[in-house]
Amino acid sequence: MDTEYEQVNKPWNELYKETTLGNKLTVNVGMEDQEVPLLPSNFLTKVRVGLSGGYITMRRIRIKIIPLVSRKAGVSGKLYLRDISDTKGRKLHCTESLDLGREIRLTMQHLDFSVSTRSDVPIVFGFEELVSPFLEGRELFSISVRWQFGLSKNCYSLPQSKWKVMYQEDALKVLKPSKKKASKTDSSV
């Protein structure tokens, strides 16, 4: 298998300072390479590749993603690459379940996708099948995404998207409701 996964065990704030999500695909036409930014799935802008003629294929793909989630949250999920030019949003790649409290580094030699060099590159990434040890109901953490386009000095970011989960103590309370003494209260005005 030519796909490698690596998860780096560093605090997220260190990783976040180290790199601000420079997610890029290396595309190839003949002997010529060009980097194309890889966008999050809820960012709708597409990117135009400035090469002349022919088709590009995705190769030497290296993706570095830092979800800003506490390592203590114990949240996992699958990272996917999707073709949004396809009406069904065909999945180009989906990883195994990964710990979202650590940086994800994905390396692939080839991606089964090609597009005309005169068109947009409609590949996005996202997360699915999120698993948490907590029940739904309370805000415990959020995820924020930042990335850069090519060699641009501008940094782009998405607003934080909140995930609702519940503290473990609250989950236990749901399973074992506390016995409350019935007390009468006067509601006289």
From Swiss-Prot:
Post-translational modification: Phosphorylated.
Localisation: Host membrane
Record has Amino-acid biosynthesis as a keyword: no
Keywords of this entry: Host membrane, Host-virus interaction, Membrane, Phosphoprotein, RNA-binding, Transport, Viral movement protein
GO biological process: transport of virus in host, cell to cell
An example molecular function term from Gene Ontology annotations: RNA binding
GO cellular component: host cell membrane; membrane; viral capsid
Keyword Cytoplasm: no
Family annotation (Pfam families): TBSV_P22
Highest rank taxon of the organism: Viruses
Signal sequence coordinates: none
Family designation: Belongs to the tombusvirus/aureusvirus movement protein p22 family.
Function (record text): Cell-to-cell movement. Displays RNA-binding activity.
Quaternary organization: Interacts with host protein HFI22.
Protein name: Movement protein p22
Record organism: Tomato bushy stunt virus (strain type)
